[in-house]
A protein has these predicted regions:
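Early extracytoplasmic/domain-onset interaction patches
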Residues: 90-163, 501-529, 566
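Short, conserved helix/loop micro-motifs enriched in His/Cys and acidic residues
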Residues: 351, 380-404, 434
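Secretory-pathway-linked proteins and extracytosolic
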Residues: 78-79, 84-115, 220, 232-243, ...
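A surface-exposed beta-strand-loop module
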Residues: 175-246, 283-318, 512-514, 565-600, ...
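Cysteine-centered nucleophilic/redox motifs
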Residues: 146, 223-225, 259, 371, ...
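Compositionally biased alpha-helical segments
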Residues: 35-128
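Hydrophobic/aromatic-rich core segments of domains that either
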Residues: 409-499
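Long hydrophobic segments that form regular secondary structure
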Residues: 491-593
């Protein structure tokens, strides 16, 4: 689920985070600091009570303790569990909800809804304010305050939170984290519930991201949690940009949600809104007493939304706000070009790698494929995006060749310089997933980009290449980047293009099944499955598995055909050959695959037609539906019939066709052979509720009808003497509990 991100987007936790320091909270902080140093002692009693303050004296079996409110108390040592030295935070001196003086919190708690008012919600966001203060030098103070109430057990997960940050240019601070219990007690976060973790410490070249984890204490159903966070940044650059990308609305109710931007009047901001219809946030634009421009957007959605299967990304459905300091694509292009040139490998090291890749002979296409495959096989992939890397400064290709591991971005930099070395025209590009809307030209910042890709010209053919999978052939880009808007460096600027969709050649699955049906209803099967494009990556990943593990995988595959299926043999094609499709060949036996009502009548399901209709189970939709990729699948089943048996024809067709969907199936008998064939093609990935989805559902319904049909066989002498009613007998009325639908 997409949430507000400030590029590098993943430096923030997957929960939306911005914070707000109220005047009352600041006052409380100042008064607390005057009473105690920055750190304080937390005294834990055996009964579970927590007391915050300072230890004055320990002796004679007693502990003298100064409470946070200034009172003094003496505790018996035997009633004390332990003492923790912890940072003292604003509000830590308050132990009871009745003692809270912050008017904001008092008002929110007084009006907090009950679980009965939101019976379908796990929690409700009572208040959230995200404040971004831009300073004259371009640095930003990003603050977030959030109060939410836990209504059901799944909502307890909200007690565990994280702050992601790029430690080389950002400084996080957890100002406070309080739990307001349903019993009126207030519990505070202490330093033992905090941990600061590096994410990519094992790969120091990419180790910019850290995570500050914390867990609020004593969170239970009915509790309200109140968290205040802050991240302070250094000034951004074209290759370390700052982008605010916020989508309003979430599954759980949001009673009050506000984004506030404060910036000098002379700082130009690029502000873009999307899906700004219906329940759009209300905007105000003023100038404060300091002369700074203050823009705020307020949003409320007391209902939340009910998610639908395969629904489009929130950022393409709900109101979306994107803000970045005004700059230009030319500035980004100039900075990145300098970075890309600087990252070039030394000629000696690059030539050694090209020799290692085996490009001494062959066409330019063959050389490009060998270089690409050498990078996939010899440069271990570090799975992190440009967001995780924390910027768009090109990683050194020399370091990649020396260390032999790299991110997708770094792999792409190496491939770029290698292809140029053999004389191929190549453009370096960046892309964002089509599900998130791709790169938007009207937002002049690389901060939108998730990862890198190349556009190569070979023998007059334009080929797009990504390096984010070890198993995709050269020219087969990842599904996320198929049909998306990408930005390519050309000369002194970035130009924009839509990457090609997958087609019936690159995204496809073909299955050929040869079945010998015995008179007792058992079958012997030879099942050949051919995968191309994104469907082959999972199969190729099994190449490193042991033979026993491969056999278990094959056994599981045939069990999905029929629970009684028994694997006889299996084989894979050469999984190291990326240019050839992946082929899996299975041989198996299924006893009782067909039902025998008598010695002259037999019926069986077409076990190799398996449609799942979950994606079209809704009669109507509120939100658009996305499918994985544009693709084509075909199935051919050849059944050798037992002696004297003939198929009882269906006398009906199963097909559906429109401009972006095509399904057809046929079943015919030729001699002793029954031949089934079907084909399903989809050339659109997003289906709007009012027009495209009804057509998608109609197509899936036709496929579901086919899935419900039984193949009925009769001996020839019975067929010859049967009554007209018997000849028309089919099992199409037979109920079947499987969920049919899209393959």
């Amino acid at each position: 689920m997409r949430r507000i991100s400030v590029v590098p987007a993943s430096i923030f936790s997957t929960t939306i985070r911005t914070l707000f320091v109220s005047a009352m909270a600041l006052t409380a902080s100042a008064s607390l600091t005057s009473l105690f140093p920055l750190h304080a002692d937390v005294l834990y009693l055996n009964e579970g009570e927590e007391h915050i303050g300072n230890i004055e004296k320990i002796g004679d079996g007693k502990i003298g303790f100064n409470e946070a409110d200034g009172t003094k108390h003496t505790y018996v040592a035997t009633e004390t569990a332990h003492v923790l030295f912890s940072k003292i935070r604003p509000g830590d001196e308050i132990s009871q909800v009745a003692s809270i003086t912050d008017p904001l919190v008092r008002e929110i708690l007084a009006k907090a809804p009950t679980a009965a008012q939101h019976p379908d919600s796990d929690y409700v966001t009572l208040f959230r304010r995200r404040t971004f203060t831009f300073r004259p030098d371009g640095s930003v103070l990003h603050e977030r305050r959030k109060l939410l109430k836990i209504l059901k057990e799944p909502g307890l997960d909200e007690a565990n939170q994280s702050i992601f940050y790029a430690f080389d240019r950002e400084k996080p601070d957890l100002v406070f984290a309080h739990t307001y219990g349903a019993d009126g007690r207030v519990t505070h976060l202490t330093d033992d519930a905090l941990s600061d973790e590096a994410i990519f410490s094992s790969t120091p070249e990419y180790d910019r991201l850290k995570k500050l984890k914390f867990a609020l204490k004593k969170v239970d159903i009915g509790s309200v949690i109140d968290v205040l966070q802050r991240i302070e940044t250094i000034p951004p650059t074209p290759l370390r940009p700052y982008v605010i990308d916020a989508t309003f609305g979430q599954r759980e109710p949001v009673l009050a949600d506000e984004i506030v931007i404060e910036a000098p009047k002379n700082l130009a901001l690029c502000i873009k809104t999307y899906q700004w219809t219906g329940n759009a946030p209300r905007m105000t634009d003023t100038v404060n007493a300091s002369g700074n421009r203050v823009i705020s957007w307020f949003f409320s959605d007391p209902k939340g939304y009910i998610p639908e299967q395969n629904m489009s990304s929130r950022s393409r459905i709900f109101p979306r706000l994107v803000i970045t300091p005004e700059t230009s694509w030319n500035d980004a292009a100039k900075a990145f070009k300098e970075s890309l040139d600087k990252a070039a490998p030394s000629p000696e090291r690059l030539d050694a790698f090209l020799t290692e890749a085996g490009i001494a002979s062959g066409s330019q296409m063959m050389k490009a494929q060998r270089i690409y495959e050498a990078i996939l096989k010899k440069i271990r992939l570090v799975d992190l995006s440009c967001f995780d890397y924390g910027g768009y400064d090109a990683p050194s290709a020399d370091v990649v060749l020396k260390k032999r591991y790299a991110s997708t971005f770094a792999r792409t930099v190496l491939l770029y310089h290698a292809l140029r070395r053999i004389g191929l025209p190549v453009d370096f590009g960046f892309a964002a997933s089509w599900r998130e809307g791709g790169i938007k030209r009207e937002i002049p910042s690389l901060g939108q980009a998730e990862d890198a890709l190349l556009r190569v010209s070979i023998d007059g053919e334009t080929i797009y290449v990504t390096c984010d999978s070890d198993y995709l052939p050269f020219g087969h880009i990842a599904p996320a980047f198929q049909g998306t808007a990408a930005a390519f460096l050309e000369g002194d600027t970035f130009t924009f293009a839509i990457t090609p969709e997958g087609d019936a050649v690159k995204n496809r699955v073909d299955q050929q099944v040869f079945v010998k049906l015995a008179a007792n209803g058992s079958v012997d099967v030879r099942d050949v499955r051919c995968f191309r494009g994104p469907f082959e990556t999972g199969i190729r990943g099994i190449k490193a598995a042991k033979t026993a593990e491969k056999r278990i995988s094959a056994e599981n595959t045939v069990k999905r055909v029929h629970p009684k299926a028994r694997l006889i043999d299996f084989a894979y094609s050469n999984l190291d050959d990326l240019e050839a499709p992946v082929v899996l060949t299975l041989s198996y036996h299924i006893p009782d695959a067909a039902l025998t009502a008598s010695d002259k009548l037999m019926a069986m399901k077409n076990l190799w037609v398996n449609f799942e209709s979950g994606s079209a189970s809704l009669a109507s939709r509120t939100y658009p539906m996305d499918c994985f990729v544009t693709s084509e699948t075909t199935t051919t089943v050849v059944i050798e019939l037992p002696d004297s048996y003939d198929w009882v024809p269906w006398n009906r067709t199963f097909s559906y066709a429109c401009s972006f969907l095509d399904f057809g199936a046929s079943l015919t008998q030729n001699g002793r052979t029954l031949l089934f064939a079907d084909r399903f093609r989809v050339s659109r990935k997003t289906f709007q509720p009012a027009d495209a989805y009804p057509q998608y559902r109609a197509c899936v319904s036709a496929m579901a009808d086919l899935d419900n049909q039984w193949i009925v066989l009769e001996k020839a002498d019975v067929q010859a003497t049967a009554t007209p009613a018997q000849k028309k007998m089919t099992a199409s009325e037979t109920s079947h509990t499987d969920s049919p639908g899209n393959r």
